[in-house]
């Protein structure tokens, strides 16, 4: 066992209202950062940056305005500096996500587009100084798209291999926990090209449901089945048993946010309304929870936690430290490859991310025995092929 992977999504919009920058990441406790999201041009398959100001232009206080040459700034430079300080930290460019996924249908729809996707994504990796690609296609809708996905992964793996030289570039995907979606994937054909799968084991319940429910439970509830429309063990068993995926290639994704249900008596009961949320309706950052007046609850039978306020009658479904403990134990007993979180800006505990301060990331790290039990394989820091002078030179003046 090479050690557990701790995989955190960093979103390029976190630098705005959330005021969360790469410098704020608990870099010591993460083995991988998935930098989200790059987009895909549906006409051509070209992969491109979705917010160049956040990604490569924003000048941080330590950035000079007087550098000569063609230089990179923004989140990409800050991640590059983190990689030099924390050599276990691999940064992957995450392509797609919920909002951009409709572009995959045509963007990966022809052999020409898939070739261009692989070539342009790989060029971004070598230009930006990243360690690989994470593809978040939510979700292939039929067998033709599933076949296109396999071919897309093959082409990406070949392009990364051709470009990596002495480095080791990684290729990962984010995959669904719902049977309607995972049953369409050609897992046995995908696995040879992939370093690991990030299982999106959250969003099981939300505003689209008629009843309040658990959004990230491990097991189904036998006593209150409407409270668990989905469950994680069923998905994990499918990937391993039906799909033939090695257990250590499955990374269990967990939410660092809660989904709210208003005017309800609790899990499995009707509700009306979802409330304001922190940044979007009905969704609260974990660090804003529990809400004032609410008490945290745990159901060990289903591996789920939530908060409830009897006076406001609001339920929020989210992972507490106690639920994170149960999931860390499950990851270890099922011999999974590690943990993934969506997304890093919402955790408690700041940069140190300690379990004692409520950090979900820190809880997992502590539960598996500390950073020495994490994946220590080194990142790449040499990019002679980058178009950016300061990155190519290793950010000498920083």
From Swiss-Prot:
Official protein name in the record: Endochitinase B
This protein's UniProt keywords: Carbohydrate metabolism, Chitin degradation, Glycoprotein, Glycosidase, Hydrolase, Polysaccharide degradation, Secreted
Stated pH dependence: Optimum pH is 5.5-6.5.
Induction comment: Expression is increased at the beginning of the stationary phase of growth and reaches maximum in the early autolytic phase of growth.
Gene3D superfamilies per record: 3.10.50.10, Glycosidases
Domain GH18: 4-363
Organism annotation: Emericella nidulans (strain FGSC A4 / ATCC 38163 / CBS 112.46 / NRRL 194 / M139) (Aspergillus nidulans)
GO terms classed as biological process: chitin catabolic process; polysaccharide catabolic process
Glycosylation-annotated residues: 66, 103
